[in-house]
UniProtKB/Swiss-Prot annotation:
Alphabetized HAMAP family for the sequence: Ser_tRNA_synth_type1 (MF_00176)
Any GO MF annotation of the entry: serine-tRNA ligase activity
InterPro entries in UniProt: aa-tRNA-synt_IIb, aa-tRNA-synth_II, aa-tRNA-synth_II/BPL/LPL, Ser-tRNA-ligase_type_1, Ser-tRNA-synth_1_N, SerRS_1_N_sf, SerRS_core, tRNA-bd_arm
Annotated gene: serS
Gene Ontology CC: one annotated term: cytoplasm
Family under the similarity heading: Belongs to the class-II aminoacyl-tRNA synthetase family. Type-1 seryl-tRNA synthetase subfamily.
Job description of the protein: Catalyzes the attachment of serine to tRNA(Ser). Is also able to aminoacylate tRNA(Sec) with serine, to form the misacylated tRNA L-seryl-tRNA(Sec), which will be further converted into selenocysteinyl-tRNA(Sec).
Gene Ontology biological process terms in this record: selenocysteine biosynthetic process; seryl-tRNA aminoacylation
UniProt-annotated binding residues for L-serine: 228-230, 282, 384
Protein name: Serine--tRNA ligase
Keywords, in A-Z order: Aminoacyl-tRNA synthetase, ATP-binding, Cytoplasm, Ligase, Nucleotide-binding, Protein biosynthesis
Keyword presence, Protein biosynthesis: yes
Span of the signal peptide: none
Length: 423
């Protein structure tokens, strides 16, 4: 949600920001709708004041034993007008409807561009392995070892699902524990276990609704299956006013995530790269405005640390204005090297949403400024650290051996009963 006062003060800047995010100019329309709403509110307050005066007059006349039929009739007429204006305000949702579908304003340092071709590489880490044999895909390796079954999954649920067996099922669990241990024991995140069914209001709070209603699974009673733990974790502070001394709040969770992948027809149709259901470890931070920028850098470092421990080559990209998510003001993607595709693929996305989500959730913090207590909207950040399915892909492909076995990364072996190989 946007600050209308900011738009009124900076209409050209706001339009420039929206155009950079591939949206049309809307500042003038927002200003006009806001003026219309305020005119109605002014009329409403004036009528309420007039009715209160007449009410006091009626009470005095009754006390004095004087007839007050004229005043009573006037009060009824004013009440009807008040009801009419209240109905007009309720029905006139154009301003809110428009604000609900406009993305966040990009940070000043975000590169301008229409799509991923304008994303900027920040740094690389690790070395790509030179194979002396023909590299296999993760699904070729998994199916050959009889540890990955797409056919049986399709019988159960359709396309874009997978069944992991034995050592790969164990690897899936091991990765979750490995990541959560890093986040909680070394970086101070609090682990949360949360529902995977949420109210639509929670989806609205983080910006998933109303614009992306077709991207998530809807159940009866207006529940949604979470597309990411970000939804649940961020909404834990919905409606709260937090003491600034209690910030930052850092939360982490591993949960199944569910996505319709409505716009992904023909993309990554084989394997685990793009699934309707997958496990992911998520990081969420609730911070003050002053903590916001440094918290994003810290979050990216936490996600990078997982890949460093697994000794997987990766790069960090800053997304351009046209490629960022709806609620993000600035986003860093971490992309891991996938040998069979000879390219980097996204494995983590870390975003600073600034006060965009907090305005939708009405989440504030209290601070002292010039000896005066002030409430401000909190800043929220989220990041995947990491998507477990894609981490499995990266391990299988980067650690594959000529005989089709997979060497288990050293950092994971204590989570895998000290096994050295998947075979």
């Amino acid at each position: 949600m946007h600050d209308v006062d900011f738009i009124k003060r900076n209409p050209e800047l706001f339009d420039y920001a929206m155009q950079n995010r591939n949206y049309e100019k809307v500042a003038q329309k927002i200003i006009e709708l806001d003026i219309k709403k305020k005119q109605l509110l002014t009329q409403l307050y004036s009528l309420q004041k007039e009715r209160n005066q007449i009410t006091r007059e009626i009470e005095k006349l009754k006390k004095d034993g004087v007839k007050c039929d004229t005043q009573i009739e006037s009060s009824k007429n004013i009440t009807e007008k008040i009801n009419d204006i209240n109905n007009m305000i309720k029905e006139d949702s154009q301003l809110i409807d428009l604000l609900n579908v406009l993305p966040n304003v990009p940070d000043d340092i975000v590169p301008v561009g229409k799509d991923e071709s304008s994303n900027v590489e920040i740094r690389k880490h690790g070395y790509k392995r030179n194979f002396d044999f023909q590299v296999k895909t993760h699904y070729e390796l998994g199916e050959k070892l009889n540890l990955m079954d797409f056919k049986q999954a399709a019988k159960l649920s359709g396309s874009r699902f997978v069944i992991l067996k034995n050592q790969l099922a164990q690897l899936d669990r091991a990765l979750a524990n490995f990541m959560l241990d890093i986040h909680t024991k070394e970086f101070g995140y609090s682990e949360i276990s949360h529902p995977i069914l949420v109210h639509e209001s929670a989806m609205y709070g983080v910006g998933q609704l109303p614009k992306f209603a077709d991207d998530s699974f809807k159940t009866t009673e207006n529940f949604r299956l979470v597309p990411t733990s970000e939804v649940a974790l961020t909404n834990l502070v919905s409606g709260m006013n937090i003491n600034s001394c209690d910030l930052p709040i850092r939360l982490t969770a591993c949960s199944p995530c569910f996505r319709l992948e409505a716009g992904s027809a023909g993309k990554d149709t084989r394997g685990m790269m793009r699934q309707h259901q997958f496990n992911k470890v998520e990081l969420v931070s609730i911070v003050t405005e002053e903590q916001s920028a440094s918290e994003l850098e810290r979050m990216v470092q936490v996600a990078e640390e997982v890949l460093k421990r697994l000794e997987l080559p990766y790069r960090v990209m800053m997304l351009c204005t046209g490629d960022m998510g709806f609620s993000a003001s600035i986003t860093y993607d971490i992309e891991v090297w996938v040998p069979s595709q000879n390219r980097y693929r996204e494995i983590s996305s870390c975003s600073n949403c600034k006060d965009f989500q907090a305005r939708r959730m009405n989440t504030k913090y209290t601070t002292i400024t010039n000896n005066v207590k002030v409430s401000k909207f909190a800043h929220t950040l989220n990041g995947s650290a990491l998507a477990i399915g894609r981490t499995i892909i990266a391990i299988l492909e980067n650690y594959q051996n000529m005989d089709g076995s997979i060497t288990i990364p050293l950092a994971l072996r204590k989570y895998m009963n000290d096994q050295e190989f998947i075979k």
